[in-house]
Amino acid sequence: MDIIYISTPHNTHIQYLRKALAAGKHVLCEKSITLNSEELAEAIKLAEENHVKLAEAMTIFHMPIYRKLSEIVASGKLGPLKVIQMNFGSYKEYDMTNRFFNRNLAGGALLDIGVYALSFVRWFMTSQPTEMVSQVKLAPTGVDEQAGILLTNREGEMATV
């Protein structure tokens, strides 16, 4: 076995990443690769120490529409981007037993689909955001049910999600 694909619920990723990377296996892990930056730093360090590759599976970048958008932006036909707006959503019937509404199972809109929207705008921004402001609406279980995010960078680009 050369590579391990992790597609379990988000809250279990780090435990499987630790085992796979420590065993010297390359890993492709579904989004969100980890729950926070500390876990991600740990996973990256393990990959480096064991000389293996670690990658996050993000389907949107392989969809034809995203590839076409990338081509158009890269061509310069639109000029420099100043504002990027991304709306991404899904409807889930509220059910406090569903993993999407369960804090212990890393539920919430941002970890489930918000990563797609944030990855999209980051793909097109020239540099890392220097400022990020957000507002969320919490479900009764405490997970984020809705979110709005504003990102800006040193080039003056702005993105809304």
Q: PLM features: residue spans?
A:
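Predominantly a Rossmann-like dinucleotide-binding segment in NAD(P)-dependent oxidoreductases
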Residues: 60-132, 140
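Rossmann-fold dehydrogenase core element
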Residues: 41-59, 80-84
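Alpha-helical elements of Rossmann-like donor-binding domains used by nucleotide-donor carbohydrate transfer enzymes
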Residues: 3, 15, 42, 64, ...
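Contiguous beta-strand/loop segments that form the cofactor/metal-binding neighborhood of enzyme cores
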Residues: 119-161
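Beta-loop-alpha module in the N-terminal Rossmann-like domain of NAD(P)-dependent dehydrogenases
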Residues: 1-46
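A short helix->loop->beta-strand "cap" motif at the edges of active sites that frequently abuts
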Residues: 23-25, 50-53, 156-158
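Structured beta->alpha junctions
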Residues: 9, 32, 39, 58-61, ...
